[in-house]
Amino acid sequence: MWRPCGSGTVYHDLGNVNYTYIVRANGTVDYDAVLSPVIAALNAIGVPARKNQTCDIAIGDLKISGSAQRMTKGRLLHHGTLLFSSDLGVLDQITTRRKNDCFQSKGTQSAICTVTNIREHLARPMTIEEFRERLLNRMVPP
């Protein structure tokens, strides 16, 4: 899927959790400001997440989340994906470049990286529904 705010390939399946922030902006793109609450929420529920050099969220060297931003009219739209229990085999198949690609992308070139599912790194098993609820409760004040 192509996003008007840039970034590379976005993969969606039933094991994927998406989030979006729309906030007032001061004219600068600040990934730390919007990724910090996501990372703090993940850490609070036992996911050892951190921001990597390319502003993705990772566990160690394995990517679990990508995101993109767009600023317009004093507002910042930031949205991201979280791989909870995605089918990584399908993800690999559709993101692997083939010699005979029949189209040329106008979007941002996707970075090649190794990914993992969050579920594999939890101290105790939980469903995607429980994960979503716990994440939301940590990211959004009551």
Predicted regions span which residues?
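Broad gene-expression machinery/nucleic-acid interaction feature
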Residues: 16-18, 54, 63, 77-81
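Short acidic-glycine loop/turn motifs at beta-strand connectors
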Residues: 14, 59-61, 72-73, 86
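Long, positively charged amphipathic alpha-helical accessory segments at protein N-termini or as interdomain linkers
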Residues: 38, 45-47, 65, 73-142
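Beta-rich nucleic-acid/ligand-interaction surfaces
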Residues: 51-69
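N-terminal lobe of the biotin/lipoate ligase/transferase fold
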Residues: 1-29
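Long, well-ordered alpha-helical scaffolding segments within enzyme catalytic domains
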Residues: 28-44
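Conformational gate/switch positions in structured elements
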Residues: 8, 57, 116-119
